[in-house]
């Protein structure tokens, strides 16, 4: 016979790693082409002028310029405008 009752298996004790989602470059920041602006699940924020969208809904700059967050038709949109020198 067992001298000790077997320990019950725990139901908790696990946690998923964070995915580091969110805005990576903010309004007014200067960015280079290819810089990631937003990492997101689904289109919380839509791509505007000079912004591309990856298959995982990541928004990235297509040109060098300044980031601008706007609303268009009730949707949040992020655009990149060239900086005048």
From Swiss-Prot:
Compositional bias of kind Polar residues: 1-11
* Alphabetical keyword list: Ribonucleoprotein, Ribosomal protein
Q: Which domain of life does this protein belong to?
A: Bacteria
Q: Name the encoding gene, please.
A: rpmA
So what family is this one in?
Answer: Belongs to the bacterial ribosomal protein bL27 family.
Q: Does the keyword Ribonucleoprotein apply?
A: yes
Question: GO BP, one example?
Answer: translation
Do you know which PROSITE patterns this protein is assigned to? RIBOSOMAL_L27
Q: Where is this region: Disordered?
A: 1-20
Q: What is this protein called?
A: Large ribosomal subunit protein bL27
Gene3D superfamilies to which the protein is assigned, alphabetical: 2.40.50.100
Q: Which Gene Ontology cellular component terms are annotated?
A: cytosolic large ribosomal subunit
Q: Which InterPro entries match?
A: Ribosomal_bL27, Ribosomal_bL27_CS
Any one Gene Ontology molecular-function term assigned to this protein's record: structural constituent of ribosome
């Amino acid at each position: 016979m067992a001298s000790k009752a077997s320990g019950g298996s725990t139901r908790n004790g696990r946690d998923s790693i964070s995915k580091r989602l969110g805005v990576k470059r903010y309004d007014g920041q200067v960015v280079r082409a290819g810089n990631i602006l937003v990492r997101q699940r689904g289109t919380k924020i839509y791509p505007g002028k000079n912004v591309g969208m990856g298959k995982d809904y990541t928004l990235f700059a297509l040109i060098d310029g300044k980031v601008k967050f706007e609303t268009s038709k009730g949707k949040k949109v992020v655009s990149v405008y060239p900086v005048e020198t």
